[in-house]
């Protein structure tokens, strides 16, 4: 939806809403970042992510925001960040260096594991 490296800027309403969520997270976490990328994601069972890095730039930070309205722990859908499992909890923002290996675990339910993935540059 938005990526400065790939010159993507969809300018759709959901992009504006995602930007508002980003700014709210920054304020609550007391972070100063300039957004570089916004991706929306939705995964179903069997859709495990490969472990990957969002960036190789030490000045970039990833914010993974879980968007599901309801989620039960037994549904799984954790995120692995540097070999640590982070439980999917609605309205949770997971913040980590973009250089960290991470990946999402497929849910054990027919419900989508939804999220917004932000990459920001420290300012």
Task: Give the positions of each predicted feature.
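Conserved short histidine dyad/triad with adjacent acidic residue
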Residues: 40-57
């Amino acid at each position: 939806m938005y990526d400065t490296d790939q010159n993507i800027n969809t300018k759709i309403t959901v992009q504006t809403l995602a930007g508002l969520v980003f700014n709210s997270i920054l304020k609550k976490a007391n972070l100063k970042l300039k957004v570089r990328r916004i991706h929306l994601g939705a995964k179903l069972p069997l859709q495990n992510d490969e472990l990957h890095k969002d960036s190789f730039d030490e000045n970039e930070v990833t914010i993974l925001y879980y968007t599901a309205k309801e989620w039960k722990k037994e549904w799984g859908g954790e995120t692995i960040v540097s070999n640590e499992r982070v439980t999917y909890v609605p309205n949770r923002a997971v913040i980590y260096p973009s250089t960290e290996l991470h990946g999402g675990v497929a849910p054990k339910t027919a419900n989508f594991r939804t999220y917004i993935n932000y990459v920001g540059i420290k300012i």
